Amino acid sequence: MNQSSDAAVPPTLQAGGEPAAVLARHSLRGVVAWAAACIVSAAVAFGAYALVYPERMPAALGAVVEEITGANPQPVHLMRPARAPLSAVALLGKEIFFDQSLSASGTQSCASCHSPNRSYAPDNAFPVQIGGAHMSEAGYRPPPSLTYLYRQAPFSIGPDQGDTDVPVDLTQLASQAAGVQRAQKTALAAPAAPAMVPQGGLFWDGRADTLQDQAIGPLTNPVEMANKTPEDVAQKLSHTKYIDQFKQMFGPAIAANPSLLISEAMFAVGRYQIEDPSFHAFTSKYDYWLEGKARLTHAELHGLQLFNDKDKANCAGCHLSQPSKDGLPPVFTDTQYEALGVPRNPAIPANRNPKFFDMGVCGPFRQDLAKETQYCGMFLTPTLRNVANRKVFFHNGVYHDLKQVMDFYNLRNTSPEKIYPRDASGKVQKYNDLPAQYHANVDASDAPFDRKSGDQPAMSEADIQDIIAFLKTLSDGYHVGGS
C-alpha cells in the first residue's frame, strides 16, 4: 500500500525534522524575550516620564522617583510674603538702618553688623564685633542674622499666649513649667505635649519682643552704637537729612518730642524689615525644590534625608524643614531655646575673666529670669536659612565653618576630648562655658546627643559632607535652571 511521505515521519518530528519539544522551547524563549523587551521599554518610558514629570508619579512611588531624579515628587505651593513697593515709613526705616551718624562714633550703622551682602549678618569672621564711642569696645556675642524674623512671636514660656493685652508674668510661667518634663525633640514628629520651654523673642536671649524693641537696643549699647541715652539718639535724629520726612508723616511737633521721635523711628526700622523682601526672600534652591522647580543632587538629597532622620542628624527636631499645611515656607527654626554646651571661646575679651559666663536666658543681659536657673545656658535656636553665608556660629562665635559645627554635634558626647580642652590634670573640661551647677540643663537626650563617650557617632564623615551640601541649598538667590 502506497503511503504519503508524511505518514513516514515519526510522531515526535515535524516535517522539517525538528522535534516538537525543541520548537516549543524556541517559541517560549521568543515569548520571554519579547516580554522582557516590553518590560524594559516600559521601564525606560516610565523612567523618562518620571524624569520629566516627577510630580505626576503616584505617591507610593515618591521615594523611588525622588531618589532617581532628585526632584520633589509631591511639590507644594509656597505662600511667600506679598511683594510691593516699600511704604513711605519703610523707606524712612531704610534710611535709618544705613545711617552711621546715629552712632556715637559716627561710623557705625545697623548695616555695619547686619550686612545685606551677608544675609544681614556680620560681613567678617570676628567672633564679636567692635563698637563703642571710639570703636574700641568688643561685644559679647556675634550679631545674629536679621533675616526670617517676620513671623517671630514675642518671648514666652510654654505654648504661645496669643494676642492678649494682659502682661505675661514670665516668672509665673517658669514656675508652672518647672515641674514638666522636657519633651524630646524628634525630626518630622510633632511633640506629644505642648513644649513648656522658652520660645520666641529676639536677640540670643529673647529679651526683645518686637523688631521695634530690638532696633533700639544697639543704639544705646555701650559696646555697639554707644549713645548714652535715648535722648542722644533723638538729638541725632533731629539733625538728619530725613527729619523733614518725619515731620511730613507725623507732624512738625515730633522733632520736639524725643520719646515719640524714637518710637516712630524704631517703628520705621521694623517696617523696613517687614516690607523689604530681602529680609525673607525664600529664593533658595530648597524652596524651588519644594515647589518642584529644582532638583537636588544625590549629595544634597541624602543630606536632606539625614537632616530629617531622627536617628542620625535629627536637625529637623529643632530646625523645622517642612512647609505648614497652608503653604507657609519653613524658616528652619522652632524658635525655642536650647542649652547645647558649646565650648568656651577664648577669643572673646570678656571670657578672659574666668568668673564671667554668658548664660543666655538667665543672664547677664536679661535679668527678669535670673532666678530661673533651669534656663541657664539656653539660647535661641536660629534659622538655618543662609547659614552657609555665615562666618561664625553659635552664640559665642566659637566655630567658623559648618564642618566644625557638624563635628560638634557628632562628637560632643561620643568623643568630648575632641571638642573641649583639658585642665592641668588632663581632665576634659566638658561644657566649660557653663558653671558646673547648670550642666544638667544641657541637652543630652535628643539625637545626636543621645550617646555616651566611646559610642559610635551618629554620622559618618560622608554623612556630614552631604548634610553640609544640603545646608548650602538654603541660601537665597538661587536661579531656577542654573546655580
Model-derived regions, located:
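Periplasmic c-type cytochrome electron-transfer domains
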Residues: N2-S483
